[in-house]
Design a protein with these regions (language model features):
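Short, surface-exposed beta-strand/strand-loop-strand elements in extracellular ectodomains
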Residues: 168-169
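Structured, solvent-exposed acidic/aromatic patches
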Residues: 1-150, 162-164
């Protein structure tokens, strides 16, 4: 496994928080949150509904560190095309139990698909690792995220000063 600088910083943030060193956890998380590329643009950004509409369900823009799985489309089809892995048969089950039925969470609105079986039974399955035909050649869509920018925000909110937590939230 090869980890770049920001993956190491993200892992440090997670570890420092685990061991109770909130100052170092906050500093490491901030290093990832404020990271810029060579042009001065943010290196990572939080996902948007637009990412989901483009079929990028794992939100590669948020990923600091991930694992590549070349056969992700085949594995997704194997696991989610039947009635083995699903989260309920009603839309309210997914929305209430997982997201609190806010109506504004982009995951609540875009990450679940109603799958109708040959016997007319229907199930809600997660699209997160679905690789669509349009994106199947893109390497970024064949990854399983391990460290994300969103986690760095949560660590910074938990470990940083209260005034900073309000700004980051």
């Amino acid at each position: 496994i090869r980890m770049n600088y920001y993956a190491v910083k993200a892992l440090q943030a997670r570890a420092y928080l685990w061991f109770g060193d909130t100052q170092k956890a906050y500093e490491a998380a901030q290093a990832v949150i404020t990271a810029k590329d060579e042009d001065g643009n943010p290196r990572f950004r939080l996902g948007t509904a637009g990412d989901f509409s483009e079929g990028r369900f794992t939100l590669p823009c948020e990923q600091v560190f991930s694992l590549y799985r070349f056969d992700l489309q085949d594995k997704y089809t194997e696991l989610f095309s039947g009635d083995g892995l699903y989260k309920g048969t009603k839309e309210t089950t997914v929305k209430k139990e997982l997201y609190g039925n806010t109506g504004s969470d982009i995951r609540e609105m875009n990450l679940w698909n109603l799958l109708v079986m040959a016997n007319k039974a229907s199930y809600y399955v997660c699209n997160k690792y679905q690789v669509t035909e349009a994106t199947s050649e893109k390497e970024e869509d064949k990854v399983i995220p391990l460290l994300r920018l969103s986690e760095m925000y949560l660590i910074a909110i938990e470990a940083g000063p209260e005034t900073e937590a309000q700004r980051l939230w």
